[in-house]
Amino acid sequence: MYKTMKATHYIYVLFAALFTLVCAGCEDRLNIEKHGSLGGPENYYQTDEEAEAAVASMLISWRDMYSNWFYVKNCLSDDAYTGGGSRGDNAMMEQLNEFTFFTDNGLISGLYSGLYAVVYKANLIIENVTGDSSVMRRAVAEAKFYRAWAYFELVTLWGNAPLVDHLLTPSEYHVSNSTPEALWAFVEQNLEEAISSGALPSKANVDDADATSRVTLETAKAYLGKAYLFQGKYSDAATVLDEVIDSKKYELYQGSFDMLGHAVTNNCSESMLEVQRRKNSEQAWNQFVQFYIMLGWRTSHMSYGPKALFEEGIAMGTYGFFNPTKSLYDAFVEREGVDGYRLKSTMRTYEQMNEVEMAINPGLYLVGNEGYFFWKTRLLGSDNIIDQSWFQSLQYTNLRVMRYAEVLLMAAEAHVMGGGSADKAVKYINEIRTRAKLAPLSSVTLDDVKKEKRLELCLESVRFQDLVRWGDAKAVLGEQGKFIPAYGYFPKIDPSTGEVMKDAQGNPIFEFKLEPENTKNSVYGFQDKHMLLPIPYTELNVNPNIKQNTGW
């Protein structure tokens, strides 16, 4: 199996090689037309069209690192087991999920280099697009936003990553570590400059999907608020996040909750930031990303009845990674009960899967599974770019990065922790709960925020960094990976002989069950060193000025 999409760009890559590689095939990634021919930096970036092409190239790099971004952050959380077809199906994901990874983990190195590829493309725009047209000023503002976005991930995951604020000359390639303080200041500066530039538009109204396909003023403010929140600047966070909310340009999607991760809600009223996709059959394979294949259930191990295929429209040809944990299910039940609307829209029990004619095939079992299945990330045939029953993973669902629900939850936390408006904290949380068909709360604590955020945004790439900043990671993740469950059909063992029982024809007898300790690991769980990810060894090998994070 193809296991990872590794970026190979480093912060010291030569301009010519990288620029030539990524400036082709941009038209279908965003609503940006690309015209003209490529030249060197001395005669490029002179027109609006060239500025837009440079933005499209930056967004291709952003798209290309998305899968690694999603895998790393969600494997490190307690929302899901790795899953897959068998133990070892994707060893790098298992290492992350069980905290047994080292400096050579390909997903970590792919994310690290992918983030710096985005930084490099942003630096190209910021330094070379110098015109004063509205298109060029917007290009620079967007570049500053994405540079800040990349450094938010670098500082929260690596802490001491190198700060590259300009295009490097050969003598500067060996950049040394920065500090969290310097990186946070850089994130704030870039977002503040993007916001104050006047070049980022606001949506015309909550349903303005065209504006949502690009970075808006409110999106930049949302990320500035997030940066403040992570630094404990609660009053500042509350102020800027309130501005996003008070703009009334965004609202929670009021359709079916289980469609929030599907094409019908691309750039909807709740969308803050998404990697754009296009339903263009001529560009279908050019838009292929591994992400969708990984999320769907394990087609080879399961049967799909007519109800699943035709009434629910479930897509086939997927690999079955990311199975929800019982811990996540129990958290839902505690908050909503076993019949909770948001629970059933997010995940299903095996019995509920049977109701839609989904079943594990006799003689097979699912590794990293406790009998629960994500429903919110199910693949649908209606989301396919092209209609082909044998392979339904060419989806045009936008890749979600932030939605408005996260803004409400962050704002509530900022008010609670900063001694701000208790009424606003209650109002924001109750907007989330009302959509989830839950009774409103009369007061809100940090514990309420934590619980609501886990349920609302599970498997949406926020949980691990939240656990770390809250100081909860060791308590929550310390035992993760000790046991890996499996669910399905297992050979029935004769307790008196220890041998597999057989029927009259000599065939093995299977029993359907959960094996909670199908795999037992001697090394597992979050340790102090996992507060920061390791700098990839590939970077250490080529840059003598980088020092490794503590414990690695």
Language model feature labels by segment:
Residues C26-K73, N541-W552:
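Membrane-proximal, proline-rich intrinsically disordered regions
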Residues E49-E50, V55, Y66, D89-G110, ...:
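Elongated scaffold/linker segments in the mid-to-C-terminal portions of large proteins
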Residues V140, R147, L217, L224, ...:
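Structural register within alpha-helical repeat arrays
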Residues Y234, S421-A422:
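TPR-repeat structural position
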